[in-house]
Each structure stands twice: as structure tokens, then as C-alpha cells.
């Protein structure tokens, strides 16, 4: 088989994206309608969640269609730097397109948490291992138990949650006492895609934690990098 033959089979581009940004209710309805019309015309499939705190979604379509969709979304949100990751698929990854208005784009269950106002400090991928090796740091995996079993950074705290809603209770029971005993510890968090640890950092800041960091837009591929024992 020629080298290019395998590439010809890959017809579809997948985009996983999110952005914490304040959106008015009336704007949500307009954005939902325009994106739904575009997805229908371009035969894009997937799911998008829209809320007053931003947008979160995963879609699949031809490369040109996905490029047009992301450009349209950025225009509607009035941003130029939406958090998006791309991958490829030999077939359409989803059955239909759904755009939904929700209370949260990632559910933690606390109305007062607002990542559009405050989040932790970003850690670049190239600086992550240095943070892991810092004896004055504590690292938290904000993913659920199922995801953690697939792979994680050695030494990271596992909250043992089945859903993100359980994270605040774990913080109150386990993390708060730890930081009270060791107030100089820096907190670092990671997840898949970046959305959960970004919102988790907003929650920690709201709870009074000061030295809060999170890995910028981590993916499963990053989990293969060296970890501390």
C-alpha cells in the first residue's frame, strides 16, 4: 500500500473544544440556531453545550466543514483563541448533531463558581514535569475513577470520584485539611482537555486557596511523558 493510501481513508476531522466566556441568554439562542443551521448544511455531527459560562462540544465532519464551524463559533463568541483539539476519523464519529442550552458546560453543581472571572495559573506542557518534581507541590487528577485507571501521573492524588459533582466534597474532606497543615504547598491539577481542571481551579480560588495551578489543555498523549515515582 502506498503511503498516501491510508491518508485517503481519513475523511473526517474531529474537533473537541471549550471556552469559558460570559454569554447572555438571548445570545445563547441565536448561537444555537446559527450553529445548528451550519451543522445541518455541512453535515456536521456531534454535541454542543451552551450556557451562561461558555461553550463545550465535540463535533465531526469534513476538514473544510470543521474549519468553517470553528471560525463561525469564534466569530459568534467574539474570540480568536477558543480551546480546540483536532483528531481524525475514517468514518463519521457521531450519529446526529445536538446543540443544547444547559446550566453549566461542565457540571460541578455550584452556581457561584464562575471561571469567566477567575481561574488558576496555567502551566505549559513543557513545564509540567518540573512542577511534578517540585517537593513543595501537590498534584490532583480531576478526572473520574474510570479515566484514571486508563493512565495517570505517578504521585498524583486521586479523588476517587465517579462524577465531577463529587469533587467539591473531596476538597472539603481531604484537600482542605492537607493545605491547612502544609500552607506553603502549591496545588497543580490536570484532566483531559482542560475544562474540568480549569473549573476546579475556579472553585478552589472561590474557597480561599491561593497558589492554584492547572495544566494547560492536557491530552491523553501527554500522559505518556515521564512521571515522578
Q: What is each residue range found by the language model?
A:
Residues 105-183:
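Positively charged, proline/Ser/Thr-rich regional signature most characteristic
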Residues 57, 172-218:
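Catalytic cysteine-centered active loop of the rhodanese-like fold, especially the PTP/DSP P-loop
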Residues 63-112:
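Extended, charged alpha/beta regions that create polyanion-binding interfaces
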Residues 222-229:
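Single conserved hydrophobic/aromatic residue that forms the stacking wall/gate
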Residues 3-24:
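Short glycine-/aliphatic-rich beta-strand segments at the starts of folded cytosolic domains
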Residues 50-55:
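Short Gly/Ser/Thr- and Asp/Glu-enriched loop/turn motifs at secondary-structure junctions
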Residues 25-42:
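Short amphipathic alpha-helix segments
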Residues 19-21, 57-61:
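Short beta-strand-to-loop capping motifs
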